[in-house]
Amino acid sequence: MFLLCYATKKQQTALLFIYADQSKNPESDAAVQEVRRYIHSISGFKTITIIERETNWGLARNIIDGVTTQVNHFGRVIVLEDDLIVAPYFLKFMNDALEVYKDEQRVGHIQACDFTKDISLPDTFLIKWTGSWGWATWSRAWKHFNPDGKELLAQLEARNLTRYFDFNGNYPFTRMLCRQIEGEK
């Protein structure tokens, strides 16, 4: 996972934080070591800080810890998964959006990809959608994050919001949440 903090319009002024998880099992040791060799070759940022986990934290715990640590320190954060290729103006778009919506309490997350497949939409638009592929947030919004899937599901069901949560029945978020909860046991 890559976190960019205080990135400006130019990548060379961005602070890059890389969170590298440890392997789950001996079979993945070689792949993890290959990734670690690669991340040590990255350049082109003002600073690069690499956090290499000594044990396997798992995806959720690693992301939650990384985002929480950096957003609490910097007040905002841009998050990327490690296998993404971004557009040349990605940082400009994210930083501009973080600035424009910084005080808009109804906006808690900037998403950098569009799954709607609706070509009639403008280049930027508001949508009730969150995702993990290139996103950004502020400490004011992250403080509301609750990683407890059981609690979220209970709240959605109590308020009859599962269809709304599923993007009006267009995406199976509730099913994904139930699977996550099953995996938490």
Q: Locations of the language-model features?
A:
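An acidic/histidine-cluster motif and surrounding catalytic segment
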Residues: 1-79, 84-185
